[in-house]
Design a protein with these regions (language model features):
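Central hydrophobic cores of alpha-helical transmembrane segments
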Residues: 78-91, 145-155
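N-terminal signal-anchor transmembrane helix
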Residues: 1-13, 17
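Generic transmembrane alpha-helix motif of multi-pass integral membrane proteins
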Residues: 55-83, 132
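Alpha-helical transmembrane segments and their helix-start/interface "positive-inside/aromatic belt" motifs
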Residues: 12-19, 69, 142-147
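Membrane-embedded alpha-helical hairpins and interfacial helices in multi-pass inner-membrane proteins
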Residues: 3-7, 28-57, 98-102, 106-214
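Mid-membrane cores of alpha-helical transmembrane segments in multi-pass membrane proteins
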Residues: 63-64, 82-87, 122-126
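Alpha-helical transmembrane segments
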Residues: 14-31
C-alpha cells in the first residue's frame, strides 16, 4: 500500500531534510577549512597535519564508506556502481582541488604530474570494495559476517590502491609502513566502522518494517 501525500511525520523531516543538510554542510565546512589552511599556512607544520586528516576523512567517506555501505545492505551491483561513481567524483575533485589540470604560463599542461595511475586507482579501488562487499555479504544481517566482509574488502582495496600508487611517476606514498598505515590500515578501520553502521541501518529497517505491519 502506497503512502498518501498527507502522510508525513517527524522522522520524514528529521531524516529527509535535516540530516542530509547537516551532512552537506559538514562536508562544505571541511572543504572550506582545507582551503583556508592552504592559503594561510600551506602544507607545512600543523596546517599540513590538519589538511592531511581532513583529506583522509573526505577520501574514506567518498571512496570507502559509500560503496561499502551500499554493497553490504543492498547488493554487488549497487556497491560496484556507487564505487565507480564515487571514485570518479573523488578523482575529479582531487584534480580540481590541487589544480592538476591547470595550464601554466608557457602553455604547458600540469598533466606532466603524471598522476593517471593514482586517479585510476581511486576509481578501481572504490569499485572493487563495493562490488566485493555485495558479492561476499549476500544480504546477510549477521554482524560477524558483515564485519569480516568490511575488513577484508577494504584491505584488498587498500593494497590495490597502494600498488597503483607505485605505478605513478609522481608517487608520494611509498610502499612501506607509512604507506600501509595511510592507505590500508585507515581503510580497514573505516571498513569495521561501516559494518557497524550497516548493521544499525538493517536493524532499524527490520524494526520499522515490523512496526509498520503490526
Amino acid at each position: 500500500m502506497s503512502i498518501g501525500w498527507k502522510e508525513w511525520n517527524r522522522s520524514d523531516i528529521k531524516y529527509g531534510i535535516i540530516v542530509p543538510i547537516i551532512v552537506v554542510l559538514v562536508i562544505a565546512g571541511l572543504s572550506w577549512v582545507s582551503s583556508f589552511l592552504m592559503r594561510s599556512g600551506g602544507m607545512t607544520g600543523s596546517s599540513g597535519i590538519i589538511i592531511g586528516i581532513i583529506n583522509t576523512i573526505e577520501e574514506l567517506t567518498i571512496t570507502v564508506a559509500v560503496p561499502l555501505l551500499l554493497g553490504l545492505v543492498w547488493n554487488r551491483w549497487a556497491g560496484g556502481a556507487s564505487g565507480f561513481l564515487m571514485g570518479t567524483v573523488w578523482s575529479m575533485w582531487y584534480a580540481v582541488k590541487y589544480g592538476l589540470y591547470s595550464v601554466f604560463a608557457g602553455g604547458q599542461s600540469a598533466r606532466a604530474f603524471n598522476l593517471g595511475p593514482t586517479l585510476l586507482g581511486w576509481v578501481l579501488s572504490a569499485m572493487l570494495i563495493g562490488y566485493m562487499a555485495g558479492a561476499l555479504n549476500k544480504h546477510s544481517q549477521n554482524f560477524r559476517r558483515m564485519l569480516i566482509v568490511g575488513i577484508g574488502t577494504t584491505a584488498v582495496g587498500g593494497f590495490f590502491l597502494l600498488g597503483m600508487f607505485q605505478l605513478s611517476p609522481s608517487n608520494v606514498v611509498p610502499f612501506d609502513f607509512y604507506g600501509f598505515v595511510l592507505n590500508v590500515a585507515t581503510r580497514i578501520a573505516a571498513g569495521a566502522l561501516v559494518a557497524i553502521i550497516a548493521k544499525v541501518f538493517m536493524w532499524y529497517g527490520v524494526n520499522f518494517h515490523k512496526t509498520g505491519t503490526a
